[in-house]
Design a protein with these regions (language model features):
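Amphipathic alpha-helical scaffolding segments comprising HEAT/armadillo-like alpha-solenoid repeats
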Residues: 22-37, 59-71, 93-112, 121, ...
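Bacterial N-terminal signal peptides
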Residues: 6-15
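Core register positions within helices of long alpha-helical scaffolds
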Residues: 53-56, 82-90, 126-129, 155-158, ...
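Sec/Tat signal peptide C-region and signal peptidase I cleavage site
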Residues: 16-20
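Residue-level detector of extended alpha-helical repeat arrays and alpha-solenoid scaffolds
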Residues: 43-47, 62, 76-81, 120, ...
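Short inter-helical turns and helix N-cap capping residues of alpha-solenoid HEAT/ARM repeat scaffolds
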Residues: 42-43, 72-77, 115-116, 144-148, ...
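Positively charged n-region of N-terminal signal peptides that target proteins for export
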Residues: 1-4
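Alpha-helical, heptad-rich or low-complexity scaffold/stalk segments
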Residues: 37-89, 213, 230
């Protein structure tokens, strides 16, 4: 029954998904349908085999999985989300680093094609888990998206090796100062301290709170008097 369901689902999706084939002459759509039909797997080895097959579908397979996500009022996404989460976990293993690029590209394309905000956020959260500095432009693209901005700034904040790029974005103020200050705190970006201190001069309450938090994490002696004044104003014992 599950296999029939996935077959009907794929029939309603993109015709290009039929094109690529594996050694068993299965199309990408068939490989994904077979994998979804076997999830959740009872044994670890079976699970690994399923993830390996999903990974083998490359960018096109990830995009197709993304297109299968539906709005919450239209159906359930548990199996597809489980598959995407599993593939991302699989390619973030040290010995699978060479397979990560296609998954990252697939997630970026899936985000762009998706029109449902919660599903876009889910896809971006998965990209965050496997992102490299090459994905920074993807996150920057959504910094001004009313719904995705929070996920985008989290992506930047948690991407390894993004310190220099983040500092440049802070200098250009490509996003609200409050969100950028949050990223500084997560990254412990000491080089951003002078900018944060300057921002405090005309910051609103939420931005002040974010800046104080960031400075408490990565600030130097240059921030001590500022933090002390803020603590006293809040009647916090210093």
């Amino acid at each position: 029954m599950k296999k029939i369901f996935w077959a009907l689902t794929f029939a309603a999706l993109l015709p290009w998904s039929i094109a690529a084939q594996d050694a068993r002459q299965r199309t990408i759509a068939t490989i994904i349908a077979d994998a979804l039909d076997q999830l959740p797997a009872a044994k670890q080895q079976d699970y690994n085999n399923i993830m390996n097959e999903l990974m083998s579908t490359g960018t096109a397979g990830i995009v197709l999985l993304g297109e299968m996500l539906v709005p919450a009022d239209k159906g359930k996404n548990a199996s597809i989300e489980h598959a995407l989460y599993g593939v991302v976990s699989y390619v973030t293993a040290p010995d699978k680093a060479d397979k990560r690029a296609e998954v990252r590209k697939g997630l970026a394309k899936a985000i762009e094609k998706c029109t449902d905000n919660p599903n876009r956020a889910f896809l971006m959260s998965q990209l965050q888990r496997c992102a490299t500095v090459e994905d920074i432009p993807v996150f920057v693209k959504y910094l001004h998206d009313a719904y995705l901005a929070e996920w985008a700034i989290n992506g930047l904040a948690h991407t390894e090796g993004a310190n220099e790029a983040l500092l440049d974005l802070i200098k250009k103020e490509v996003a609200p100062r409050e969100k950028l200050a949050y990223a500084v705190g997560v990254k412990r970006l000491k080089t951003a301290e002078p900018i944060l201190l300057e921002w405090l001069k005309n910051a609103d309450a939420p931005t002040q709170k974010a800046i104080y938090h960031a400075l408490s994490i990565c600030g130097s002696s240059a921030s001590l008097s500022t933090l002390e004044k803020a603590a006293k104003a809040a009647k916090y014992e210093w």
